[in-house]
Amino acid sequence: TAPGDDAGLFLTNLRVRGWMDHETLSQHRPDLVMVTLTGDRHGRPQVDYTVNPALGIPHMTGPADSDDPVAHALPAWDLIAGNMCVSALLAAERHRLRGHGGQEVEIALKDVAAATLGHLGMIGDVTLNTEDRGKSGNALYGAYGQDFVCADGRRVMVIGLTDRQWRGICKATGTVEAMTALEQRLDVSLAEEGNRWRFRDDITAILKPWFAQRRVPDFEAAFNDAGLTWSEFRSVREAVELDPDLSTENPIFSEVMQPGIGRFRVPSHPASFGAAERVDARPAPTLGQHTEEILSNVAGCSSTEIAQLFDAGIVQSPSFAKPRNAA
């Protein structure tokens, strides 16, 4: 509620009531912009791992021969909701900068997921068609994309989504004639991505031996020179150790010493702005790091009052416990 163009912005994922709600805070700053992320539109609590199964995604995730739902590790709805909250905050601030005042904005996590399903066509798909979309393992839904195990035991993902990608795969693997024969046998054109999806098992049967007979280094350079869309399966540790895009060669990354934890690579914003130089990532504030500064500069407490708060155990300075993992 402080004055100025760079203040009066409040983003929270708590169902705030009383002194922290919009009605109360806006009495101190009428043009306050407040964005609240809730669980669902009814006010019930939700998290990514409850929204995801409720909307059917686990039933289309995992091995094709399994009926068990699979809750994937990526918190997709949290990530999308976070970006939507920022977009909403900036949109409301833009509204305010045009002289139209502040406002309260509410976004529900489940609504974010439901809207995304609609945007992806999944709601229309099950409404207009008779079959649910099932599991397809690592296959790219709707076109062609498949993982293959190579002679050195390494696994790669190869994509034939567009016509150019598809023709590139066939040429690089020397399977043009075999794919043409498959088209003639099935009486279809594999230039159509829907047919590549429909007959993906037949296509994979042709390509699988080619990869099984070769190590990744045998075709890596040729695939890259041909502009194919492919990658290798790696663990997070392997990616951090081997992929230059996760190293400081990539300008979004810099080495940061995080107090109480250690030194590791941290990304800044992935966007590059032409009108501003990139700012490297900085250590995250530690709990209690700015306690005295806030009490003094924001709350207006005297040094004596601050000392009394510390002595009473109401506030404290940073303390570093044993490092823990991300969970």
Where are these regions (language model features)?
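Aromatic-enriched alpha-helical interface/lid elements that frame and gate functional surfaces
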Residues: 144-226, 230
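Short Gly/Pro-enriched turn/cap motifs at secondary-structure boundaries
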Residues: 132-140, 146-147, 198, 261-264, ...
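Short, surface-exposed loop/helix-turn segments at secondary-structure junctions
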Residues: 48, 124-133, 173, 181-183, ...
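Conserved PLP cofactor-binding pocket of PLP-dependent enzymes
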Residues: 224-247
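Amphipathic terminal alpha-helices
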Residues: 304-327
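Flexible, small-/acidic-enriched active-site or ligand-binding loops
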Residues: 259-308
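Active-site-adjacent "lid/gating" segments in soluble enzymes
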Residues: 5-6, 14-161, 168
